[in-house]
Amino acid sequence: MDELLSYSDIISIHVPGVPNGESLINIKELNLLKSECFVINLSRGGVVNERDLFNFLVLNQNIQFALDVFENEPYSGDLLNFKNITFTPHIGTYTKESKNLMEMEAVKNLINYINS
């Protein structure tokens, strides 16, 4: 992963949550990024350590981030002060199909509870 981080111009992160609440991207990994890298996190909150990201961006204003997920949502932390971060809502489940499936699953669970 070190090589990927140090050579890539654009990095898009799509991983499941990290076990034990450990972050995948911490200050060590952030310091490997190219000076004008663009990083997109579309995976899970906590994959990028937000405190380390804040400390890193104070000194590295050329690196761009796009964040779709956060450790705590809705996000209201200090990262909002950076102009080199784009924030988007995590709306991956807001398609008609996925909402319909979630609603059907909720109804099934309710029926199973009532019948048990």
Model-derived segments and spans:
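Rossmann-like adenosine-cofactor binding region
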Residues: 1-78
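C-terminal helix-to-coil terminal segments
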Residues: 72-116
